[in-house]
Amino acid sequence: MKKIEGIEELKEQFISQLKPLKIYLFGSFANGTYTEENDFDFYIIVSDEVKELKDLTTQAYRSIRKIKKRSVDIIIGTESTFENKKKSPSVENEVMKKGYCYMNQKAKSGLIWH
């Protein structure tokens, strides 16, 4: 995937503020069909221990408010929810099939930066 302006700053902010297990970019930026008008679509996977996903989503948007250079859509889900839904028709299935994993905390070699 070619380097996309502004995306590294967003990823770093998500990592420091949300402590995610995985961060996926999906939609037009992941499949290379984006234009200047398109937004970033992120699916962020967090631990099953996180119970207040709505609060975490609000925190995610607040954390990038001053650094984002285009519109951003964020979906936050737990690891078990993602695993349960990724094989059926769902956003999770789309993310799994066509998304780009930007960060994987659970990779065998440790933290992976893509």
Predicted regions and their residues:
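Catalytic core of pol beta-like nucleotidyltransferases
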Residues: 1-22, 30-36, 46-114
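Short, aliphatic-rich beta-strand segments
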Residues: 41-45
